[in-house]
Amino acid sequence: MKTILFLFILSVSLFSKVDINLSHTKIKHGTTFAVVLQSDMKLSQAPNVIYKNKTFQMFTIKGSIKKYRAFIPIDYYSKKQKENVQVTYKTNDNLIKKNYDIEIIYGNYKQNEIIKVSKGKVTLSNKNKTRSTKEYNTVYKNVYSKITPYDLTLNSPFQYPMESKITSDYGNARIYNGKTKSYHTGTDYRAKVGTNIYSTNNGIVVLTMHRFYLGNVIYIDHGRGAFSYYSHMNNFDVKKGQKVKKGQLIGTSGKTGRITGPHLHYALRLYNTTVDPLQYTELYNKILKLYQ
């Protein structure tokens, strides 16, 4: 009798159901896709997603030990091609590997956004080159290199930093004074000096500073590799280390840094990769709603 019972339990464990879903089979460069795993039994350990030789841990959805998700960034400079996505998980110490294909396609980003600024903001002096490099290193140390392994959003959907007209989309190729220098790493909102800016979700302020290009900027950690940041601000109403709630006033818009006029530059980094913040918001909120 004991042997029969043991065999029954073993058979149930071996044939447990695991469903894996990808949000996209075709995905634009500069955006984000999601992987969701659902199991009818507790896994031996948290599953992982392997993409382009990088391992991304999957995290529980709302604390459930049977539902996991991961958001994976597609670098803006990714080539148009098929890529492998591997999901690994353990059941009864058996390592299972599942492979999927996604196709990277080029987004319909604007290719000739012309911007005129002072010459010194395009061709930097040695002093400003040193300054810019030092600023980047500070941000990398305090923001880009960090991954908080738990959810700071408290399972809350993202909102927008303000209600205003979008004047420049993520991904646009930017031509400064006649030369293509970069692509737009965020979304610009029309905002006169002094317009209120709100945190797009719960999180922790990890850095506030003045940067050569971005001017006054706030970085907020939302956990699990996601950081939002708000640039060209006039003033800060929060400080480093402070917890903020979604919709909380964090400061006002300004005209600091390399700009042609006052506005808010809103951006998001996921695992140290800039992604379209509005597409990420839409996807994050959709996954949160579908897998409650």
Regions found by a protein language model. Name each.
Residues 109-141, 145, 239-248, 267-292:
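Acidic, glycine-rich catalytic/binding loops that coordinate metals and/or anionic ligands
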Residues 185, 200-234, 262, 267:
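Zn2+-dependent peptidoglycan hydrolase active-site motif and core
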Residues 196-206, 235-253:
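Short, well-structured beta-strand-loop connectors
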Residues 3-14:
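Sec-dependent N-terminal signal peptides
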Residues 99-214:
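Surface-exposed, glycine-biased beta-strand/turn segments
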Residues 38, 210, 248-249, 255:
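Short, surface-exposed secondary-structure boundary micro-motifs
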Residues 17-110:
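Cationic-aromatic interfacial patches
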